[in-house]
Amino acid sequence: MSLSALESTINSAFDARDGISTSTKGEVREAVDQVLETLDKGEARVAERGADGKWKVNQWLKKAVLLSFRLNDMGVIPGGPGQATWWDKVPSKFEGWGENRFRDAGFRAVPGAVVRRSAFIAKNVVLMPSFVNLGAYVDESTMVDTWATVGSCAQIGKRVHISGGAGIGGVLEPLQAEPVIIEDDCFIGARSEVAEGVIVRKGAVLAMGVFLGASTKIVDRDTGEVFIGEVPEYSVVVPGALPGKPMKNGHIGPSTACAVIVKRVDERTRSKTSINELLRD
């Protein structure tokens, strides 16, 4: 089926999803399987960046992923330590892979790396023991470091470094929610968390322990400008706090966590300066 035919079939099936189960056969199952394969190969992606810098979300692809949970039964997944098994509906991306398949794919997957089928991993990516969920897209030359997670349908750009223990949130439900997007050349510091559809624009640097959600205020220290839901390109961001407001008893209330843009750099400076130097105040 063409992508337009797939989209029509998936949208219709999703509207009638209460009637879809593991016993469903025919066109719907074939369409969902084809979509998952297309996502897995990177031939389609849940979100695409336009020439104007705006991201378009292909909601129907997310619907296909959701339908797969209704269509697919639980099953034993082999490959655990000590010949243990797992019990799930989503097989490993690497099921049945041998040396030739890995060489053709062109990325590294260190023992302990888990990637679920329908996630795309581009060439020269390095996956340390980490987790990449279904529908995600990880572009070329990116590092997903130890115990980092890339959530469902998240979009990770080229030459991104996702440091140890960092979390990139996933989003399948609510269906209208936007996926988390990390654009090219970003650095996500250790134990940071980016969730709830936040966009981190090109070349931005998040220090260790920065937490960003849809309502997190991102304050530019120099200008006082406040951003919500998006980190401007080439920003250097650290954890911070906004002063508390006076309470009814006259005392100052508790402070509120925020993120602080401590500086902005241009592309040339970003490419020539180490992360540690950028984060020094």
From Swiss-Prot:
Q: Which Enzyme Commission number(s) are on file for it?
A: 2.3.1.117
Which cellular compartments is it found in? Answer: Cytoplasm
Question: What's a GO cellular component annotated to this UniProt protein?
Answer: cytoplasm
Q: A GO term (biological process) for this protein?
A: lysine biosynthetic process
Q: What is its main location?
A: cytoplasm
CDD domains per UniProt:
LbH_THP_succinylT (cd03350)
What's in the keyword line of the UniProt record? Acyltransferase, Amino-acid biosynthesis, Cytoplasm, Diaminopimelate biosynthesis, Lysine biosynthesis, Repeat, Transferase
- Name the pathway: Amino-acid biosynthesis; L-lysine biosynthesis via DAP pathway; LL-2,6-diaminopimelate from (S)-tetrahydrodipicolinate (succinylase route): step 1/3
Quote the record's binding site residues for substrate: R108, D145
Please list the reactions this protein catalyses.
(S)-2,3,4,5-tetrahydrodipicolinate + succinyl-CoA + H2O = (S)-2-succinylamino-6-oxoheptanedioate + CoA
* Listed InterPro entries: DapD_Trfase_Hexpep_rpt_fam, Hexapep, THP_succinylTrfase_dom1, THP_succinylTrfase_N_sf, Trimer_LpxA-like_sf
**Can you name one GO molecular function term for this protein?**
2,3,4,5-tetrahydropyridine-2,6-dicarboxylate N-succinyltransferase activity
Query: Pfam families in the record, alphabetically?
Result: Hexapep_2 (PF14602), THDPS_N_2 (PF14805)
Q: Where would one find the signal peptide in this protein?
A: none
Q: Its family?
A: Belongs to the transferase hexapeptide repeat family.
Q: How does it assemble?
A: Homotrimer.
The record ties this protein, via NCBIfam families, to:
dapD (TIGR00965), PRK11830.1 (NF008808)
Q: Name the chain's protein.
A: 2,3,4,5-tetrahydropyridine-2,6-dicarboxylate N-succinyltransferase
Q: Which organism is it from?
A: Bradyrhizobium diazoefficiens (strain JCM 10833 / BCRC 13528 / IAM 13628 / NBRC 14792 / USDA 110)
Question: What does UniProt list as this organism's lineage?
Answer: Bacteria, Pseudomonadati, Pseudomonadota, Alphaproteobacteria, Hyphomicrobiales
